[in-house]
């Protein structure tokens, strides 16, 4: 039911209240996501530990990869980068996270489909992902004890979701290929 509320907010407030298709100043999906994060912070940021789907799910939750990274960088006791799921687990979605951001493989399949159908071009997703890869690679090279590898950066969190599905929104993204690369 939370997803339905998010969709109603995204379409009703994020899109239609501004005049409908082509008139909205914000990405409606992102507006819906922000609405849900503000309205239901616990439900949007707490996930059952993988393999722990029992009647006691609320008591057995796992930290997300982003929560682990944040804890390590801030010096939280008992947190280590070794607590992160493997790159393969991040790829297939065997970790906690928000709806739409846990399985990098599913997101990449969505990207391939949209490129194949010519719904989007490669410019925006590739420029965003390449930029993050380069800068996170520099940080990892500087201090690999507190910064994760660029591959883990790409596979964890909402980066791919944003780069593939949100940044490519027709209304709120550039139209020229040069603009898309800079964006």
Where in this protein do the model-derived segments appear?
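Short hydrophobic "helix-edge" motifs at membrane interfaces and signal-peptide entry regions
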Residues: 16-18, 90-93, 108, 158-160
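Hydrophobic alpha-helical bundle architecture
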Residues: 110-123, 136-183
């Amino acid at each position: 039911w939370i997803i339905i509320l998010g969709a109603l907010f995204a379409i009703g407030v994020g899109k239609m209240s501004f005049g409908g298709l082509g008139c909205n100043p914000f990405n409606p999906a992102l507006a819906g996501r922000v609405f849900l994060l503000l309205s239901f912070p616990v439900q949007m940021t707490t996930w059952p530990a993988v393999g722990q789907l029992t009647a006691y799910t609320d008591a057995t939750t796992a930290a997300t990869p982003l929560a682990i990274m944040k804890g390590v960088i801030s010096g939280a006791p008992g947190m280590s980068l070794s607590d992160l799921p493997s790159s393969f687990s991040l790829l297939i979605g065997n970790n906690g996270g928000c709806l739409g951001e846990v399985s990098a493989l599913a997101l990449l399949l969505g990207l391939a489909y949209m490129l194949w159908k010519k719904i989007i071009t490669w410019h925006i997703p590739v420029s965003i992902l390449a930029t993050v890869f380069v800068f996170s690679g520099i940080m990892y090279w500087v201090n690999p004890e507190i910064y994760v590898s660029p591959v883990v950066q790409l596979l964890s969190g909402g980066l791919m979701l944003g780069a593939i599905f949100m940044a490519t929104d027709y209304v709120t993204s550039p139209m020229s290929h040069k603009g898309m690369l800079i964006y």
